[in-house]
């Protein structure tokens, strides 16, 4: 059998990207608008006391990863699609502008590229369309992927595929970030969360995403703006990049102030192992300039 030279191949095989506040800046205002819509939904549709809503909204987000997951865990009953439509349907998407620089950067990457987000598929489609990034990703792992409704079909008209799954995630020891949110059934291979929604920063959500995307976590980089998500991703075995931060938090291998800085901070995405070694050698042993004489 002929041996295969792996030195000319990139170090990484897949790049997983969070979407909101990662592919675009927090300063867009969508995050704040989304929070206001959630608070309004809690007040108008769930009858929660107005004075309790702001703190409750934030506390549930911190505890469960999303306010929606927290509300479900507390026993509030509502339709998932209706909730997403209320929260995202009125967002000021016009504040998002095409990002040709990021588009060029993404298209230049030789690896598979997949979105991994807690958001629903309609929101994903709107955001990627506004940013002009519809054809930059192979697929999307979204809310419906990890929490499939009775009827969930792939949508291919967007230029990317919404990934689906019927896998069962085997339980592993969860990080301290999410231990308190899960019941592990000893008699079964299936891990059943107390909350009826599977989402980041659950380590199981990352394990599910790894299986759905069919990737090797040791050869996959995960980009996210959330320190909790980064910590969970590291527990799941992924390489991690915190986006929008100046400090390398626990679990982060690299911190970027902006997603636009990927090439400077992570040249190995574009370089093969052989090219990276050559570049490092040049830095360690720069060529010595030779003085030449010109006779005229």
Give the ranges of each region predicted by the language model:
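Asp-based, Mg2+/Mn2+-dependent phosphohydrolase catalytic module
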Residues: 1-12, 107, 121-296
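Conserved short hydrophobic patches within well-ordered secondary structure
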Residues: 34, 38, 42, 116, ...
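Structural motif corresponding to alpha-helix initiation and N-cap regions
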Residues: 99-103, 203
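Short, surface-exposed alpha-helical recognition segments that flank or form part
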Residues: 29, 93-97, 115, 193-201
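N-terminal helical cap/lid subdomain that shapes the substrate entry/recognition surface
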Residues: 2-17, 22-100, 111, 120-122
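Short, flexible active-site loop motifs that bind/organize anionic cofactors or intermediates
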Residues: 43, 73, 92, 114, ...
């Amino acid at each position: 059998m002929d041996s295969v030279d792996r030195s000319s191949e990139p170090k990484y095989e897949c790049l997983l990207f969070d979407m909101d506040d990662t592919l675009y800046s927090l300063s867009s205002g969508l995050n704040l608008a989304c929070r206001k819509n959630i608070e309004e939904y809690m007040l108008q549709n769930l009858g929660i006391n107005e004075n309790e809503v702001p703190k409750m909204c934030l506390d549930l987000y911190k505890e469960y990863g999303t306010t929606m997951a927290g509300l479900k865990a507390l026993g509030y009953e509502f339709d998932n699609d209706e909730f997403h439509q209320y929260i995202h349907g009125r967002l000021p998407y016009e504040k998002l502008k095409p990002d040709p620089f990021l588009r060029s950067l993404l298209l230049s990457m030789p690896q598979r590229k997949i979105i991994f987000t807690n958001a629903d598929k309609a929101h994903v489609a709107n955001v990627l369309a506004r940013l002009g990034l519809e054809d930059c990703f192979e697929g999307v792992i979204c809310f419906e992927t990890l929490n499939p409704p009775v009827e969930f079909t792939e949508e291919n008209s967007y230029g990317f595929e919404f990934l689906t799954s019927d896998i069962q995630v085997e339980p592993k020891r969860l990080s301290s970030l999410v231990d308190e949110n899960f019941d592990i059934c000893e008699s079964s291979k299936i891990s059943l969360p107390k909350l009826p929604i599977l989402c980041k920063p659950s380590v199981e959500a990352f394990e599910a995403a790894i299986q759905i995307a069919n990737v090797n976590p040791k050869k996959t980089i995960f980009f996210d703006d959330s320190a909790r998500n980064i910590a969970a991703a590291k527990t799941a075995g992924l390489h991690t990049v915190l986006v929008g931060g100046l400090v390398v938090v626990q679990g982060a291998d690299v911190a970027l102030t902006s997603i636009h800085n990927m090439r400077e901070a992570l040249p190995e995405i574009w370089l093969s192992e052989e090219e990276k070694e050559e570049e490092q050698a040049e830095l360690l042993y720069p060529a010595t300039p030779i003085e030449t004489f010109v006779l005229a």
